[in-house]
């Protein structure tokens, strides 16, 4: 029997990027934050590899990846950022994800997951 229909499986953005792709997104994101003159001082003395690991786990969940049992959100809030600075950090994430051509609702979901505003 011959089939002419294509079978598709719904895939999350995490499936397309994979763990290595999510790490690359986080590295680019942290570079943008570190290049911001107002935000860079908050990263001084911080264990950046550990921060990147936490952010990678949060972002992976926001993009449809496995939860890994980690608590969601608040990583940036603990640094003492103002609301405006916090939004700028999330805007940098949106810029990196937008550069990948991801849909708007996926970008917003990722921002919410990282900010701890949405159940993941």
Regions found by a protein language model. Name each.
Residues 1-120:
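Core of compact, soluble alpha-helical bundle domains
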């Amino acid at each position: 029997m011959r089939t002419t229909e294509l079978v598709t499986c719904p895939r999350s953005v995490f499936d397309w990027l994979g763990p290595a792709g999510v790490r690359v997104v986080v590295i680019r994101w942290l570079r943008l934050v570190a290049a911001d003159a107002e935000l860079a001082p908050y990263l001084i003395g911080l264990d950046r590899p550990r921060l990147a690991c936490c952010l990678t786990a949060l972002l992976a969940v926001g993009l449809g990846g496995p939860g890994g049992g980690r608590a969601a959100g608040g990583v940036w809030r603990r640094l003492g950022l103002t609301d405006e600075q916090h939004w700028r950090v999330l805007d940098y994430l949106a810029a990196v994800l937008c550069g990948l051509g991801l849909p708007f609702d996926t970008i917003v979901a990722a921002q919410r997951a990282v900010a701890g505003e949405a159940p993941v």
